[in-house]
């Protein structure tokens, strides 16, 4: 298995992992691999990681491999494109249940070419591609529903493809309504309490549209990785705008203090902006919304977090999407779409650096094939997330653009010139 060099985990990284296990899964009653979690925690607490606390000897095997070798062995490479389409020079994707969870509630949607419906009334049909990540919680039903129905709902939207922003907004609103009607029309006795975040990339000719509900994220690498920028904004209670919206709706935001009873009287309530700003500087703080206990403030579905009949505060959890639009240009390298399991342990910079590490480290042996290189980027991001002990499902999509294609072409040309010089010097 191709791996990059990594350092031994710091104490802060270990504490962060323990906190993520405790606050995000065990207490949420999510199905986890208890053996892995217990083994890890036991080794941490008993300090039996092949060295004493005073020893300077490095662990020979990376900690995540030592504890979770079986999970690494199960990891399978994802899939990638075979040819370009429109402005998309390549794409690749992969998803994995991760080190701790037994089930993968993440779903993805890949439609390289949206074909014109036979009954379509639009004369000119643009080149369009669709990519989506649906990060489920409380079960797989909602994420599966979005995956299975998003494209058909989009094609049926009255504004599509004339007004893309309205089409994306209308599609997500319809999916929220339809899922609720199908599974939870009787709010007192819901048949399915699952919910899902939604991150959509729709490429239309030379324009790129990103629609987001929840805490999955898309970032753009620019100018051969020397720059990057987040495209979407996370819908979480640590977002000041989301915090303000939740409070206005009548909800509360609190800091998860690892209290398994979830007694609202024993947690730290954030009462004002001053307290909010003070805690925001602590990377270990996990914000949650009371009374639904979610750490994300935007989802499709999730009736228990939205229905007054089930003691929720309506309006705290939103199903409204944000849409971001930009034109493609030669400086755009690629888009990375990822679920929160990736971003919980890798910063935006970490993510871009990992992707470019794969390009430069593994590209040569793949003969700088943009499709295979894009897949290496996906796989390495997931492996790096496991190295950082992400405790969640892991899903990544890479969309290669002009900048990446040109960079790889330059690599190929330099290699050809280098080989020619070597041959001439022999003569």
Report the location of each language-model feature.
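PP2C/PPM-type serine/threonine phosphatase catalytic domain
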Residues: 1-427
């Amino acid at each position: 298995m191709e791996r990059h060099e990594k350092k031994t985990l710091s104490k802060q990284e270990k504490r962060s992992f323990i906190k993520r296990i405790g606050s995000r899964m065990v207490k949420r009653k999510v199905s986890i691999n208890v053996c892995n979690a217990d083994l890890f925690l036991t080794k941490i607490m008993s300090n039996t990681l092949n060295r004493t606390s005073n020893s300077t000897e490095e662990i020979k095997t990376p900690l995540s491999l030592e504890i979770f070798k079986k999970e690494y062995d199960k990891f399978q490479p994802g899939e990638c494109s075979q040819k370009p389409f429109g402005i998309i020079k390549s794409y690749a994707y992969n998803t994995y249940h991760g080190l701790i969870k037994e089930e993968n509630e993440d779903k993805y949607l890949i439609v390289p070419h949206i074909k014109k419906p036979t009954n379509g009334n639009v004369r000119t049909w643009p080149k369009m591609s669709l990519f989506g990540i649906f990060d489920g919680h409380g079960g797989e039903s909602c994420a599966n529903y979005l995956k299975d129905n998003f494209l058909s709902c989009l094609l049926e939207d009255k504004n599509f493809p004339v007004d893309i922003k309205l089409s994306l907004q209308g599609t997500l609103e319809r999916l929220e309504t339809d899922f609720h009607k199908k599974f939870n029309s009787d709010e007192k006795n819901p048949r399915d309490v699952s919910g899902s975040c939604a991150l959509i990339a729709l490429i239309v000719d030379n324009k790129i549209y990103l629609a987001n509900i929840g805490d999955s994220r898309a970032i753009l690498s620019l100018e051969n990785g020397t720059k990057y920028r987040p495209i979407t904004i996370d819908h979480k209670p640590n977002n000041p705008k989301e915090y303000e919206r939740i409070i206005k709706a009548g909800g509360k935001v609190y800091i998860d203090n690892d209290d398994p009873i979830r007694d609202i009287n024993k947690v730290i309530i954030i009462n004002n902006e001053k307290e909010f700003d003070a805690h925001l500087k602590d990377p270990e703080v996990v914000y949650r919304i009371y009374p639904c206990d979610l750490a994300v403030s935007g989802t499709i579905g999730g009736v228990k977090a939205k229905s007054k009949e089930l003691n929720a505060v309506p309006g705290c959890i939103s199903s409204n999407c944000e849409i971001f639009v930009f034109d493609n240009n030669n400086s755009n390298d690629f888009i990375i779409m990822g679920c929160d399991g990736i971003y919980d342990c890798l910063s935006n910079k970490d993510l871009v650096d990992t992707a470019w590490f794969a390009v430069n480290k593994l590209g040569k042996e793949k003969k700088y094939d943009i499709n295979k290189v894009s897949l290496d980027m996906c796989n390495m991001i997931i492996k790096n997330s496991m190295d950082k002990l992400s405790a969640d499902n892991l899903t990544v999509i890479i969309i290669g653009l002009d900048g990446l294609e040109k960079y790889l072409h330059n690599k190929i040309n330099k290699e050809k010139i280098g080989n020619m010089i070597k041959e001439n010097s022999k003569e």
